[in-house]
Amino acid sequence: IIIGKTDSELLIATNYHVVDGADTLSVAFADGSAYEATVKGFDENEDLAVVSVATKDVSNDTMDAISVAKIGSSDDLKIGEQVVAIGNALGYGQSVTTGIVSAKNRKTDSSGQIESSDSTDNSSSINKGVNLIQTDAAINPGNSGGALLNMDGEVVGINSSKLASTE
């Protein structure tokens, strides 16, 4: 998710677990081009990272084809609202799926397990894990770090988890 652009770099938000332990990074764009990237910062607890790509390395065609994402507010999402998940499902290239918001403010514990909580209670301080937006949009391996968009095209979340089992 391109969140910033200066004369010298593109700033891209992704998940921390995507870049964790990487010695080198390569960012692939929708036009098929790929460029070396460096980690600018991260928050392991929130599973967020920002990487940068030097604009001097990026072709003019690629620069012309990209834009900085519009950031929305996940607080404004409503249960039942439609969302779009963008990613690179299974590493096959850009993918887009749609779904609805099933719940908000889901919590995970340190092992990544979903903790039971009241999905409408924003004030809970008992669960200190990451807040999650639950959606039925297909999120597959490779979608991590991709954008979750509202129907106005604004980023309201970053795809990061797939619950593989309900047991």
Model-predicted regions and their roles:
Residues 1-167:
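Serine-dependent protease modules
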